[in-house]
Amino acid sequence: MAVRMRLKRMGAKKQPSYRIVVADVRAPRDGRFIEELGHYNPTTEPVTLEINEEKAKKWLQEGAKPSQKVRSLLTQAGVVEK
């Protein structure tokens, strides 16, 4: 089973917030996921970013591939180096 770390859209219309989740690559964007790693809200000032580093590192070691945006968020949080 191939898994990917990606964003799951939450929030109201025109006010998105996102959960950072680990999901099967075949699952829909807002569908079933395996585990939640944190959340990201780009609409607040300053931007809110919270990631459970232990869970993220565990999934990266198990072979989960982060999406492009999640990779940049993990770098920003200091979980992954550039």
Curated annotation (Swiss-Prot):
Q: Which UniProt keywords apply?
A: Ribonucleoprotein, Ribosomal protein
This protein's record includes keyword Ribonucleoprotein: yes
Lineage: superkingdom: Bacteria
GO cellular component terms attached to this protein's record? cytoplasm; small ribosomal subunit
The record lists its disulfide bonds as: none
GO process terms (BP): translation
TM spans (from-to): none
A single Gene Ontology MF term assigned here is: structural constituent of ribosome
- What's a Pfam family in this record? Ribosomal_S16
Q: Does the keyword Calcium apply?
A: no
Sorted alphabetically, which PANTHER family does this protein's record hold? 30S RIBOSOMAL PROTEIN S16 (PTHR12919), SMALL RIBOSOMAL SUBUNIT PROTEIN BS16M (PTHR12919:SF20)
Give the family per the record.
Answer: Belongs to the bacterial ribosomal protein bS16 family.
Name this polypeptide is given: Small ribosomal subunit protein bS16
Q: Which organism is it from?
A: Natranaerobius thermophilus (strain ATCC BAA-1301 / DSM 18059 / JW/NM-WN-LF)
* Source species taxonomy: Bacteria, Bacillati, Bacillota, Clostridia, Natranaerobiales
